[in-house]
Structure formats: structure tokens, C-alpha cells
Amino acid sequence: MSPQIDLVRRMVEAYNTGKTDDVAEFILHEYLNPGALEHNPELRGPEAFAAAVTWLKYAFSEEAHLEEIGYEENGPWVRAKLALYGRHVGNLVGMPATGRRFSGEQIHLIRIVDGKIRDHRDWPDYLGTYRQLGEPWPTPEGWRPCPPPPRRRHDRSTDTP
């Protein structure tokens, strides 16, 4: 394997083991996966990646793992073809745990800069996973609770005597 693919395999290993104490060795301080912004909009770098690993294990159980299907590279880019296996045990964008097992293929595009992972986009099989989970509905609070409606203030200037 190439050094770039080895870096991506370290990323996959972190997702599989949940071990994140060494991610600064292979995740650049500018790391960003736009798909993770929903969970931690302010985080970047190794901390953002570690939070994504923690979330994966929280939502899909400690046994969740990525199976390596194949890797390709083109310049600074690595394309990883993976399959995620897990069990829905935690809140998933407002949908309470179903306990159901699922699997789904994914494509990850990863850019290596200065010998570390900088950019990461992933496209999981959302539809297939959703169906395997039994097509659950979010709780009333959803994944983005609505703020309470603004309190109406009484405008005394319109009062008539």
C-alpha cells in the first residue's frame, strides 16, 4: 500500500476501534468533514475527527465497524470504498434507538495535505440504512429542537381609553 492509503487505513482503524488518542499523527489541524458539521459545527482538526468516531460508536454501538472493500488514489486524493456494519443504539438525528442491525456501503473521498488527512467527504447509503432501521420517525424534539415562540409584548401605545 502507498503511504496515503496507509493514512486512510489508520482513519478506518480509529473508527473501528474507537481509539482516538493518536489521531493528531494522521489528521491535519485543518481537517474538515462537512457531513459532521451537523453534530459539531465549530470543531475542526483532530478534535472534530475524534468527535465523529465517538458519535459513530454512540449511535451505532461499540461493535460498529467499517469493512474495507477497496482503495484508489489520484494525486493527493484517496477514494475509500467501505461498508459500515452496526446496530442502532443511540439517537440518530432525532430518531431514538431501534436496536436494529444494519449494513451499508459508503464512498469516502479523502485529500492528503502535508502527510495528513485534511479533507474528508463521505456518502453513506442513507436510504438503505433508513429502511433497515425500520424507517423510524424523529421524536417531537427532532435533531434540532425548535426554540419557544417569542413572547408577545403588549403595546400600550395602541390602547384606547
Curated annotation (Swiss-Prot):
Q: Which GO terms describe its molecular function?
A: intramolecular lyase activity
The record, for NCBIfam families, names:
SnoaL_meth_ester (NF033407)
**BP term (GO), one:** antibiotic biosynthetic process
Reactions it catalyzes: methyl aklanonate = aklaviketone
Keywords from the named record = Antibiotic biosynthesis, Isomerase
Question: Which spans of this chain does the record mark as coiled coil?
Answer: none
E.C. no: 5.5.1.23
UniProt keyword annotation of Phosphoprotein present: no
User: Which pathway is this protein assigned to?
Assistant: Antibiotic biosynthesis; daunorubicin biosynthesis; Antibiotic biosynthesis; carminomycin biosynthesis; Antibiotic biosynthesis; rhodomycin biosynthesis; Antibiotic biosynthesis; aclacinomycin biosynthesis
Q: Where is this region: Disordered?
A: 137-161
The phenotype of cells or organisms lacking this gene is: Cells lacking this gene accumulate aklanonic acid methyl ester.
Q: How does activity depend on pH?
A: Optimum pH is between 6 and 7.5.
What does the annotation say about its assembly with partners? Answer: Homotetramer.
Protein name per Swiss-Prot or TrEMBL: Aklanonic acid methyl ester cyclase DauD
| Stated family | Belongs to the polyketide cyclase DnrD family.
The taxonomic lineage of its organism, from the top, reads: Bacteria, Bacillati, Actinomycetota, Actinomycetes, Kitasatosporales
Outline what the protein does: Involved in the biosynthesis of aklavinone which is an important precursor common to the formation of the clinically significant anthracyclines such as carminomycin, daunorubicin (daunomycin), rhodomycin, aclacinomycin T (aklavin) and aclacinomycin A (aclarubicin). These compounds are aromatic polyketide antibiotics that exhibit high cytotoxicity and are widely applied in the chemotherapy of a variety of cancers. Catalyzes the cyclization of aklanonic acid methyl ester to yield aklaviketone.
> Which residues of the sequence carry a binding annotation for substrate?
106
